[in-house]
Amino acid sequence: MAPLRPLLMLALLAWVALADQESCKGRCTDGFIAERKCQCDELCSYYQSCCTDYVAECKPQVTRGDVFLQPDDEYRAYDYHEETRHNTSVQEEQRIPVLLAKTEETPVLKPEEEAPPPGPQTDDLGVPEEELCSGKPFDAFTNLKNGSVFAFRGLYCYELDEKAVRPGYPKLIQDVWGIKGPIDAAFTRINCQGKTYLFKGSQYWRFDDGVLDPNYPREISEGFKGIPDDVDAALALPAHSYSGRERVYFFKGKQYWEYVFQQQPSREECEGSSPSDVFAHFALMQRDSWEDIFRLLFWSHSFGGAIEPRVISQDWLGLPEQVDAAMAGQIYISGSALKPSQPKMTKSARRSGKRYRSRRGRGRGRGHSRSQKSHRQSRSTWLPWFSSEETGPGGYNYDDYKMDWLVPATCEPIQSVYFFSGEEYYRVNLRTQRVDTVTPPYPRSIAQYWLGCPVPDQK
């Protein structure tokens, strides 16, 4: 028996080492470790790679900082009509001196003189200047991996924050993306890499953190076989989990096509790139028991490639026959919950409204100053549930309050999709594929709710 003792000791040590490698004990803050057989990082639920004791050891929670509790255009909870009256009065106060100044500077024409015919204004290079609130239709919208929204119109592009256009925009598409505008469509994949695709004519370009990938542009017929050239709009959706497949909807004329990606990047492949905040927000929600809902929302019956076209107005109820642009909104949580006592709202609370965590600022050196004043409306009315990261119910800032709570089990995630047509936009519930019925109703003004343009005078 004596010779067996060393063998038993070795077997015991090997078992202990194996058990330690397959446990999250002491590993909850270590992040992803490729050499380990199972993982304890915050994305392991999505990749279905968690150790068996992940929940017990790491106690993951979907907390108030991980979820959005209203659609993109419903981030404020204080009274919509009061805000409208406030904005209108401010605009009237600011409009009077501007009009007077213009009146004083207008030259008086002599009888023999005639005013020159109106024409488009151009810059020194002969490029037509962009007018923010012109009401002209947009060509594309997309939500970049850092949470910023980019809008494309004609030769120009805009970066939008929660309230208006960011300082320094519009800029020429060619100066920012290296492509001469206009473009036809754009989308950003919702996976750990978060690459952005721009479409124009028969070609498409792919960008990683704003840098064009090698060997691009490519032909649409090669990279997206079965999808037509000159598309009008594109819309990307995530996979329900790592075992699922991502989808893109392409729209052209009165029809739309569904394209299914055959694979998504692995966890190891994403270690070398900056994380996608949009994807991280989605993946963190895998911690809760919403697998069935995610499968319902993001399931695809195709094994990859394009699916035969269908009619827009038949499947997306409430939309016009044709659309100019489309974009998936942030997933938000719908349901009932007890509201904590509401402290007095401060000015700083009203101004807060960050979409994603602090990594959002990691862009291509864009200005992120929020000092510019905006007339932008809240993009809709409100829901009396939770909050975005920095604002609680009613737009209140709870950063100074100790609040640790879980999303109630009765809640469920809602995926909104935005469609833009002409000077208006629609919000659609992906699960029902119907335009949301809210007040004020859809369609709504793009200029007012997305660009921060003044509210029209209400008589």
Curated annotation (Swiss-Prot):
It is found in: Secreted, Extracellular space. Glycans are attached at residues 87, 146. A motif (Cell attachment site) lies at residues 64-66. Hemopexin repeats lie at residues 135-179, 180-227, 228-285, 400-453. It comes from the Eukaryota. Residues 338-380 are annotated as: Disordered. Its main location: secreted. Transmembrane segments: none annotated. The modification Phosphoserine is found at residues 289, 378. Residues 347-378 have a biased composition (Basic residues). GO terms for molecular function: extracellular matrix binding; heparin binding; integrin binding; polysaccharide binding; scavenger receptor activity. GO terms for biological process: cell adhesion mediated by integrin; cell-matrix adhesion; immune response. Disulfide bonds join 24-28, 24-40, 28-58, 38-40, 38-51, 44-50, 51-58. Sulfated on tyrosine residues. GO terms for cellular component: collagen-containing extracellular matrix; extracellular space. The modification Sulfotyrosine is found at residues 75, 78, 80, 398, 401. Keywords: Cell adhesion, Disulfide bond, Glycoprotein, Heparin-binding, Phosphoprotein, Repeat, Secreted, Signal, Sulfation. Plasma. Residues 1-19 form the signal peptide. Residues 20-63 form the SMB domain. The SMB domain mediates interaction with SERPINE1/PAI1. PANTHER family: HEMOPEXIN DOMAIN-CONTAINING PROTEIN, VITRONECTIN. Monomer. Interacts with SERPINE1/PAI1 and C1QBP. This is Vitronectin. It comes from Sus scrofa (Pig).
